[in-house]
C-alpha cells in the first residue's frame, strides 16, 4: 500500500508526510546538480538530472512521497509559448494579448512534455515501492495568469483587467489550457504517477464570481476528465489563498485531497477533513527558526488533526534558505508523534 494513499483507505494512524519543493535549493546535493545546467527548463527536461533531484529528498529524509521535479510552466512552454527563467528574477514569458496569440498557441507544440513522462517512468523504477510518486501541473488560472502578466508575483491587475474586458477570448484561453492540463495529468498517470496534484498559486487574487469561473469550474472539468481514465488515482488540489472560498471549492470540486495554506484555521481543517483529506499547513517560515518553535507549531497541527484524514505538509513550498537539519528534525518529530499517538507533550 502506498503510504500517502493510506488516509484514503481509512488508516488514520498513519500520518503521511512530504513537502512542496522538497527537491530544491535548500539541499546542497540539489545545488550541486543544478549548477551543471545553466537553463532551468533544460534542467527540467533532463531525464537523468531531474530523476536524481526528485529522489534526493527521499534518500535524505525518507518522505512518504516523491514529487516529480518539474515546473508548472512546462505546459505553456510545451505548447510553443515563449517561457524563460532569469536568475534572481524568475519566469519571464511572452505576454498573451490577442486572438492572434491564441491561434499561435494552437499550432505550435514543441513536444517537450514527453521528457516529463520519461522522467516519471525512470523515477518510478528507482523509487522504493512503499513511496508514492506525485505528478503535477499548474491549475489553468495560475498558468493563464503567468501568460497574461508575462511574469509572476505581480498584483495581477493585468490578468484581471484582461478577463473583465475580454470575456470570450479569456474563456477560450481558459478552456484550451484546461483541456491540455487534463491531458498532461492523464499522461503522467499513464507514465506511473500514483497521485496527481494541481497547484493554483494565484487563486487567492480572484473575487467569488471569477474564482468560480476560473478556479472551480476548470478544476472540476480536469478532475472529472482524469477520473474517467484513472478513477482510483487520488487528486490533490491546492487553491492557495482561497480563504472562505475553500469551502465552496470542496463542495463543488470532487477532489480527494485539499491542500491548504498556513492562513487556514485548524478548526476549519478539522471540519473539512470529514469531507476530504486535508493536507497542510505549517508556515514554511517556521522552518527558518529553531527546534523548540518547530516542535510547538507542529504539535498544535498534529493534535488538531489527530485521527483525521490528514497529510502533513507545509502551507507552501520549502524556502531556499531553510536549514536541512530543521527539515530532518520536523520529519523525525512527526514520526515520533505518530508512534506515540498520545496527548503528551513529548
UniProtKB/Swiss-Prot annotation:
PROSITE patterns: UROD_1 (PS00906), UROD_2 (PS00907). It comes from the Bacteria. SUPFAM superfamilies: UROD/MetE-like. It is found in: Cytoplasm. GO terms for molecular function: uroporphyrinogen decarboxylase activity. GO terms for cellular component: cytosol. CDD domains: URO-D. Homodimer. Belongs to the uroporphyrinogen decarboxylase family. This is Uroporphyrinogen decarboxylase. It comes from Rickettsia peacockii (strain Rustic).
